[in-house]
């Protein structure tokens, strides 16, 4: 199973093609729209969110509410395209006829963004040729793919949820004593998608302060997946390890700078006796762990405990009090360019990381249990659970 996305931030639309879903997966388009709306929400978002009202359109692969087994093509329109038709026109253009369009040319790269490296690599004179695709607007297409993946995982009893653990210097307390439903309920009631109400209020204050200063904020999101059977992934080769795939996928999200699974870097500072999860067995549960410091992964495979993964996101590169840069055509020092942007996109990043994680899990479920139809995959899944129960 894989997906591709296409589209620029201010182009006509974003397109996602998902290949490898079996036939017969029930699809709720309203659920995809809800995830798209969740991505657009969150305290600290910018003016673009007032323009876009993301809704998914199906171009292929779904009929009468179920997948066909053929590639699924999804489209999300960019409503802001109407304001950018000349700037983003695919037709040859000698000169802009609209003076406002000429002002959209970008020649001052932003520190922390793809602008300069992309211009050098692809030999672009206008940084817009880089920033349009590098923009996090592309993640709407990834959320559509991941939301579809969550619907594939649901019949297997697998659930995935993302929420915010920190923004700037404010860290939330771990959501102890709450099941996944309780965590989700608290997080979705928070303006910053944080299940800790006290920390949530302080995060809002930090975002307000950064906005006043013309600055931006990053943070850490946590994704939990429940209901995973042991044995997804493999220890046999590097590219079959689930933790490796998750790390690659999550680090590919715009502004992601670090990933840890379970106790992660904290475990590196402790002794083995304080890190590794002791194993137990009972007739009703089978094998289990007394703790979950490994975050549900050992040797590149799920071990039956909840998957817990955290992703660190740097502050957004666009600053309204810009840092030093240079004009790429003259090499003269100048303030970095400014694009319409968010102050903090960490609440949105929680949704994106949730959906990216869901797609990777769906990929490994499909690889493990196969099946050209959902029913065939579920039969294989049930057979595997019966095999495990006999151990």
Swiss-Prot record:
Its cofactor is FMNH2. Disulfide bonds: none annotated. It catalyses: 5-O-(1-carboxyvinyl)-3-phosphoshikimate = chorismate + phosphate. The keyword NADP applies. Gene3D superfamilies: Chorismate synthase AroC (3.60.150.10). GO terms for molecular function: chorismate synthase activity; FMN binding. One of its GO terms (biological process) is amino acid biosynthetic process. GO terms for cellular component: cytosol. Keywords: Amino-acid biosynthesis, Aromatic amino acid biosynthesis, FAD, Flavoprotein, FMN, Lyase, NADP. It comes from the Bacteria. NADP(+) binds at residues 39, 45. Belongs to the chorismate synthase family. This reaction introduces a second double bond into the aromatic ring system. This is Chorismate synthase. It comes from Symbiobacterium thermophilum (strain DSM 24528 / JCM 14929 / IAM 14863 / T).
């Amino acid at each position: 199973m894989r997906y591709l996305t296409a589209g620029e931030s201010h182009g006509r639309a974003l397109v996602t093609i998902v290949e490898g879903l079996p036939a017969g997966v029930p699809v709720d388009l309203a659920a995809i729209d809800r995830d798209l709306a969740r991505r657009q929400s969150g305290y600290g978002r910018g003016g673009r969110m007032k323009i876009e009202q993301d809704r998914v359109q199906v171009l292929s692969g779904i009929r009468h509410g179920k997948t066909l087994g053929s590639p699924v093509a999804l489209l999300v329109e960019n409503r802001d395209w109407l304001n950018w038709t000349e700037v983003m026109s695919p037709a040859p253009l000698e000169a802009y006829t609209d003076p406002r369009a000429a002002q959209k040319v970008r020649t001052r790269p932003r520190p922390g963004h793809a602008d300069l490296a992309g211009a050098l690599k692809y030999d672009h004179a206008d940084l817009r040729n880089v920033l349009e695709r590098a923009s996090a607007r592309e993640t709407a297409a990834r959320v559509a793919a991941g939301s579809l993946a969550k619907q594939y995982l649901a019949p297997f009893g697998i659930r995935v949820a993302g929420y915010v653990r920190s923004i700037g210097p404010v860290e939330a307390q771990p959501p102890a004593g709450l099941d996944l439903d309780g965590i989700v309920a608290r997080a979705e009631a928070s303006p910053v998608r944080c299940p800790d109400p006290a920390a949530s209020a302080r995060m809002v204050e930090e975002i307000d302060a950064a906005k006043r200063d013309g600055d931006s904020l990053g943070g850490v999101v946590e994704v939990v997946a429940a209901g995973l059977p042991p044995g997804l992934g493999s220890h046999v080769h590097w590219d079959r390890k689930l933790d490796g795939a998750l790390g690659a996928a999550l680090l590919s999200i715009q502004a992601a700078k670090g990933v840890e699974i379970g106790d992660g870097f904290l475990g590196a500072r402790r002794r083995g006796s304080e890190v590794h999860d002791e194993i137990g067995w009972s007739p009703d549960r089978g094998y289990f762990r007394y703790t979950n410091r490994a975050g549900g992964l050992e040797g590149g495979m799920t071990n039956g405990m909840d998957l817990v993964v955290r992703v660190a996101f740097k502050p957004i590169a666009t600053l309204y009090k810009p840092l030093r840069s240079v004009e790429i055509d003259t090499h003269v020092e100048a303030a970095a360019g400014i694009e319409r942007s968010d102050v903090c996109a960490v609440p949105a990043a929680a949704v994106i990381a949730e959906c990216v994680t869901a797609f990777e899990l769906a990929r490994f479920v499909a690889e493990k249990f196969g099946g050209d139809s959902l029913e065939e995959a579920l039969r294989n899944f049930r057979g595997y659970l019966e095999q495990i129960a006999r151990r």
